């Protein structure tokens, strides 16, 4: 059983598998991949993106049990400056920022190509390129203010945090940030936050108006043990920051800050 099966689908795409929603899915990558496999449909297309090799193996085995047509990253398609597969290649520009988004885009291209002979026969290469140029995902490496800079990212588990860190190192090498962070109690926020401590000028732990939110004092105490400068702040303090800021750790936080920045712009 999987809740995604409530909707009909000609294709199912798994972009990556990480340690999240473990209360529902399992406590290991293998268990989570096995649970996610319930989303695959019989005799449909199954696209497996770039992720943990053990997870990829489990996903493929389960997809084939359902007689799905499987396309696997690194074997059937891949990304190396452009989309590549045994049937051809495609150059594309991507509006979404973040190294992992290039791999996700490649999985999306493979899905369209797999369906092009039946469901999507009116879509050509230029349509795909235009779609990727215009693709937008709020709260994913999103710049909501340019000067000083505010970047929002929904990373709230170790896997997503690693993707964010890789992207920051590539796009802003050596840059230090004022970090605004909050997390839910049921998330592995210590592993998330630890990946960014060497990038922090200061960590502002944002007090969140949600019952599930971790106590900011608990997070500050953890940072104190790590020797990292930190303090508690309110959500409104993010947009008052007069230096470059990085906001992550909770989708609730990202959503609230995004609304605050939009309201600040519209108030002028």
Regions found by a protein language model. Name each.
Residues 238-262:
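A glycine-rich beta-strand to alpha-helix segment
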Residues 45, 149, 176-180, 243-246, ...:
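Residue-level preference for the first positions of well-ordered beta-strands
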Residues 1-13, 17-22, 31, 88-202:
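Nucleotide phosphate-binding/pyrophosphate-handling subdomain across enzymes
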Residues 3-6, 17, 21-24, 204-222, ...:
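Flexible, gly/pro- and Lys/Arg-enriched active-site loops
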Residues 49-69, 80-82, 149-150, 158, ...:
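C-terminal helical cap/extension that packs against the catalytic core
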Residues 1, 6-66, 189:
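Conserved catalytic-core segment of NTP-binding enzymes
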Residues 49-51, 62-80, 95-99, 125-135, ...:
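Beta-strand->loop->alpha-helix junctions that form or flank phosphate-binding loops
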Residues 76-90:
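Acidic-glycine-rich active-site phosphate/pyrophosphate-binding loop
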């Amino acid at each position: 059983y999987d809740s995604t099966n409530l909707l009909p689908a000609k294709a199912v795409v798994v972009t990556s598998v990480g340690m999240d929603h473990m209360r529902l899915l399992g406590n290991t990558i293998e268990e989570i991949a096995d649970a996610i496999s319930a989303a695959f449909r019989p005799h449909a297309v199954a696209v497996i993106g770039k992720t943990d090799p053990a997870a990829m193996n489990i996903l493929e085995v389960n997809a084939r049990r359902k007689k799905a047509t499987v396309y696997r990253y690194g074997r059937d398609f891949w990304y190396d400056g452009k989309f590549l597969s045994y049937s051809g290649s495609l150059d594309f520009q991507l509006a979404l920022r973040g190294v992992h988004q290039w791999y996700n885009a490649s999985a999306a291209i493979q899905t369209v190509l797999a369906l092009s002979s039946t469901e999507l026969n009116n879509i050509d290469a230029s349509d795909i390129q235009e779609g990727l140029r215009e693709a937008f995902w709020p709260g994913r490496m999103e710049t909501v203010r340019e000067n000083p800079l505010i970047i929002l990212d929904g990373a709230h588990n170790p896997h997503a945090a690693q993707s964010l860190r890789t992207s920051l190192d590539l796009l802003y090498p050596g840059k230090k940030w004022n970090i605004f962070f909050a997390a839910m109690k049921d998330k592995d926020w210590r592993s998330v936050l630890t990946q960014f401590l060497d990038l922090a000028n200061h960590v502002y732990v944002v007090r969140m108006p949600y019952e599930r939110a971790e106590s900011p004092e608990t997070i500050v105490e953890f940072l104190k043990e790590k020797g990292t400068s930190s303090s508690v702040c309110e959500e409104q303090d993010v947009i008052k920051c007069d230096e470059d800021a990085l906001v992550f750790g909770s989708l609730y936080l990202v959503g609230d800050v995004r609304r605050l920045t939009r309201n600040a712009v519209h108030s002028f």
